[in-house]
Amino acid sequence: MRTLLDLDPKGKRVLVRVDYNVPVQDGKVQDETRILESLPTLRHLLAGGASLVLLSHLGRPKGPDPRYSLAPVGEALRAHLPEARFAPFPPGSEEARREAEALRPGEVLLLENVRFEPGEEKNDPELSARYARLGEAFVLDAFGSAHRAHASVVGVARLLPAYAGFLMEKEVRALSRLLKDPERPYAVVLGGAKVSDKIGVIESLLPRIDRLLIGGAMAFTFLKALGGEVGKSLVEEDRLDLAKDLLGRAEALGVRVYLPEDVVAAERIEAGVETRVFPARAIPVPYMGLDIGPKTREAFARALEGARTVFWNGPMGVFEVPPFDEGTLAVGRAIAALEGAFTVVGGGDSVAAVNRLGLKDRFGHVSTGGGASLEFLEKGTLPGLEVLEG
């Protein structure tokens, strides 16, 4: 993989694909983590004498939509990088090209949301060529988007000398440790809503791991596959056989699987609703399981004891609605308390839990990519990485 150390930026206009897909509310950025993570790459290039053109997406607009403008991101970036300014032009436009060509060394230009361009997600070759006119070299530092074969990730990288930024390199180095000779015992904690989102990563990791802890709504598909009564809990009915098969494979490989013993349940998902705790395999209708229960939190903490490598992706419950965030926070605390282990967390809610607990420094690596980290662990590569090799 070509990295920043292979690029001499002096006097060059460098096009950088960053991941500024951050939460914005009332025109203000709510979490600057991804902006801060991009700064080492940007500062390195500026110190080397480059001018920079930045590309990013924000949300999933269906074309130009002021609610998804990068203007608030430009404001937040400027607070950390005074050289930066936002230009409200779609990156494939003539105006964007003129703005880019007028840049002097040391200047930074953030263009409008790449997803305002109709060809971005189709990896349109013509749009990729228009992006390529914005710079003389391309740096991919958007790990969170590296699993998407889009024009600003893959298309433009084929048309310019392309390099991995520092964040990209850091992510690949950390996640590779989870695949190549990880220190044992190795525990994986998976949560979130759907088994279908995690099948690939479970199949890839099963031969490498010792313990698999499953929480979140996806646990109910496994519990029902084992004959449990799960009330109105979310179940993927078309994945019951697959869940049973995965449990059988885990057993054959000697992997110990931990499923919830009890759950916090309610009749509907809303803050302050009346809750009950039930055994995970005996949830009565009309209740649905919305978080792992107190016994499960203790059991999961015990299951993590002594682990030397841990990967965690996905919340243990409906994290955004208290009190169903307790299980996720408990798992975050248990992993952070491990001494001498290499611990990696990825995925929006899991990372949000770690940040809320103020325990980011207690993790070996906090990944900026949820879907990207899962796909990397499943396949060992990503579309955005493949174009940087050679």
Swiss-Prot record:
Alphabetically ordered keywords of this record: ATP-binding, Cytoplasm, Glycolysis, Kinase, Nucleotide-binding, Transferase
The EC number(s) this enzyme carries: 2.7.2.3
Binding site for substrate: 19-21, 34, 57-60, 115, 148
One of the record's GO molecular function terms: phosphoglycerate kinase activity
Family: Belongs to the phosphoglycerate kinase family.
CC annotations in GO: cytosol
Subunit structure: Monomer.
UniProt GO BP: gluconeogenesis; glycolytic process
Pathway: Carbohydrate degradation; glycolysis; pyruvate from D-glyceraldehyde 3-phosphate: step 2/5
Annotated residues for binding of ATP: 198, 289, 320, 347-350
Acyltransferase is among the record's keywords: no
InterPro entries with a match to the protein in the record: Phosphoglycerate_kinase (IPR001576), Phosphoglycerate_kinase_CS (IPR015911), Phosphoglycerate_kinase_N (IPR015824), Phosphoglycerate_kinase_sf (IPR036043)
Chain coiled-coil ranges: none
Protein name: Phosphoglycerate kinase
Compartment annotation: Cytoplasm
Catalytic activity, reaction form: (2R)-3-phosphoglycerate + ATP = (2R)-3-phospho-glyceroyl phosphate + ADP
Domain of life: Bacteria
Species: Thermus thermophilus (strain ATCC BAA-163 / DSM 7039 / HB27)
Enzyme superclass (EC): transferase
